[in-house]
């Protein structure tokens, strides 16, 4: 059965020289049509060494079906491959951020965004056509500061559709229970959107390697709810960056071991988390 992301998957993992010019031209044309002179929503892609995945992501963004005026921007986060050339080839406005970390990249995007609402986009992820409008049903509410969604993985030779279904079902159930008291722990950058002015007020953490998304969500809690959207049509599809070379079973066991330690914590609210030394950004020389 065809999937909505099959076209994007056909160029996923290919270098810019391997993607047909006709597809790159199509992406360029559609991206240009999406751009508004007065955007209400800023959609910002961050990319570090994503030459082989970025074009597929941008293809999905070029086919968004939204009623909101939007801008789509890119951030090249000190890439050593041809990520920047992908941005150039499809004509997407982008910014170079030399300081390395997702926090620096997202902060760069935030500083340059013009929209009232800000959508975080990861370059290795495909976004469904109605993603923006469905997320906005939550984010546009006055008592909501930010919103997140669930996400899926695409099946491949080592990850079956059935295995992914079971893995995601268990994971989603855990996240659903956790979000009542610890919603900030359920937020992932690839499926995260917030009100721009509030994020600029609290700022995005740039001193940590991971978790800048959840940290930002925690900082936004005094200004409004952390909302979650449970809708199949608002579920992006991504690769295996969070699983790596592990099998689904290995990843599942690892998650159970990690989450099983102090599992009762998910039933109690928390307003502050201590940083671990290994997650701190080391000073660049």
Where are these regions (language model features)?
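N-proximal low-complexity "stem/linker" segments adjacent to membrane-targeting elements
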Residues: 1-60
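Short, acidic, metal-binding catalytic loop of nucleotide-sugar glycosyltransferases
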Residues: 59-69
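A conserved acidic beta->alpha catalytic loop
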Residues: 60, 76-84, 125
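Glycine-rich, basic loop-to-helix element that forms the pyrophosphate-binding segment
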Residues: 97-113
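Short aromatic/hydrophobic "clamp" motif used to bind/position activated sugar donors
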Residues: 118
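Conserved donor NDP-sugar-binding/catalytic core segment of glycosyltransferases
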Residues: 130-161
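Short, flexible, basic/aromatic active-site loop/helix in glycosyltransferases
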Residues: 149-155, 163-185, 189
């Amino acid at each position: 059965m065809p999937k909505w992301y099959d076209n994007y998957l056909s160029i996923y993992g290919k270098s810019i020289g391997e993607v047909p010019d006709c597809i790159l031209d199509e992406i360029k044309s559609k991206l240009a049509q999406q751009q508004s002179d007065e955007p209400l929503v800023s959609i910002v892609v961050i990319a570090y060494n994503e030459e082989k995945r970025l074009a597929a992501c941008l293809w999905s963004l070029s086919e968004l079906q939204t009623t909101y005026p939007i801008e789509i921007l890119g951030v090249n986060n000190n890439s050593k491959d041809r990520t920047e050339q992908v941005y150039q080839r499809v004509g997407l406005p982008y910014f170079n951020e030399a300081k390395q970390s997702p926090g620096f990249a997202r902060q760069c995007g935030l500083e340059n965004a013009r929209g009232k609402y800000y959508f975080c986009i990861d370059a290795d992820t495909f976004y469904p056509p109605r993603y923006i409008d469905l997320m906005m049903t939550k984010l546009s509410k006055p008592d909501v500061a930010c919103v997140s969604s669930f996400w899926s993985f695409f099946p491949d030779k080592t990850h079956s559709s059935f295995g992914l279904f079971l893995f995601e079902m268990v994971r989603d159930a855990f996240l659903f229970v956790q979000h009542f008291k610890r919603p900030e722990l359920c937020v992932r950058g690839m499926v995260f959107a917030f009100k721009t002015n509030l994020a600029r007020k609290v700022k995005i953490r740039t001193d940590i390697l991971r978790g800048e998304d959840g940290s930002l969500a925690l900082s936004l809690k005094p200004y409004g709810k952390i909302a979650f959207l449970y809708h199949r049509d608002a579920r992006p599809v991504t690769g295996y960056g969070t699983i790596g070379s592990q099998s689904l079973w290995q990843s599942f066991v690892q998650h159970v071991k990690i989450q099983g330690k102090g599992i009762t914590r998910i039933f109690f609210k928390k307003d502050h988390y201590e940083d671990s030394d290994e997650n701190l950004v080391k000073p660049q020389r």
